Structures are given as structure tokens and as C-alpha cells.
Amino acid sequence: KIINEKILNICDNYRPNIIVLGHNNILEGSSINTIKKKYSSKFTLWYEDALGKRGEGPNWKSNLNLIEKNRHLIDSYYLTTHPDEIKTYINRKKLNFLPIPVDPNIENLEIYNCKNRFKDLFFALSHGVNFGRLKKGKNDEREEFIQKLMNMYPNIKYNILGIADENPKWNYGFFTELSKCKMSLNLSRGHPLKYTSSNRIAALVGNGIYTFIDKR
């Protein structure tokens, strides 16, 4: 309720032409309706988590339920799951594919120019964005794949975060570990879908490291 009141007050001050809902859909329908009627504002929503049933990505169903809320009031959607893979009640004309964005102010390492890359392959696993520790008793197919890879190719110098009690690193710590490596591996949970990837691919490719993706 409080956030709705704050947004209504902000809109009274700015009278926006467009409102972008960034990876959330928490406004009440009545608030959206009020803003649209008062200021003819357009609403758009971007979302970058799994939405495709066929891919069986993490929490895809609850993610889909979230974006379908207020679907009669939201004018357009920008999604990192390709619309061809999404079965939804949302009008398909509203759905647009959004490649995972790269920001040159953040992804600026230019690793291809780094001279002291003494490790071969980088991979980072986590149990949630910016979640600082691994969740006890939780594992997934990516961890199993990495263990098999390390057993098959023991001579490769690996830099693996988030496996074998090595907690994830984020921000500066993540970039420091990445810059030590010649290559990286991007693995997505669930089955591969059209144009769909873990959002970590932006941090890898955007920073200029040679990146492998899974093909099954």
C-alpha cells in the first residue's frame, strides 16, 4: 500500500508519459488504472528470469504468474525469454524479446587485452542473484556437469566459484576472478530455449572473455 501511495504522489508531480516496471509487478491494478486515466501514461514491463514451460527453468511458473498480473493494463513487455517459448494469457502483440543488456560502464574489463591470465576456464554458480552463500543441501545439473568436466579434463586450470564449499563472489570479487582466466563457461538451468540464457552471459561476453555455452 505504501509503495502505491508513493508512486501515485510521484506521478502527480511528474505526470509521466511512460512508466517502466523493472523486473517487478507490485503495483495494484487500481493504482495503474488511476495513473493511466489521469495522465494517459503507458506502462511497460521488462523481466529477465525464466518464463518458458518447455525449458523448465527455475521458478518459471511463479515468474509467469507475476508478469501476467495486470496484463489488461500493461501496454508492452520486454522479456529475455523469447515470446515463441511463452504460453500466456497476455496478448501476444504486447510481447517483445529483450536480449540481456550489457553496460559498457560496468562490463569494461576488456579481458582480451589482459596479459596475466594464468587460469584456463572460469565458471561461477550461485543460488540466487547476489545471494552471498550457497544454500545447504541444494544442487543442480550445472554442478554435476562441472564435476564431470573436471574429472574428464584434469589438466585444465579451473577457476570455479560456487562449488565445493567455495561461496559465490559478486561485483569486484567476481570481476577480479574473471580477469584471471582465458575462457569462461555459461550454463543455464533447465533445458535450452530459443535465445534464452542465464543473465551471467552479459558479464562474460560483455567483459570480453571467450565464452562457451551449453549445447544439448
Model-based region annotation:
Residues R15-P16, S40-F43, K182:
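Loop/turn elements at helix/coil->beta-strand transitions in domains of secreted/extracellular proteins
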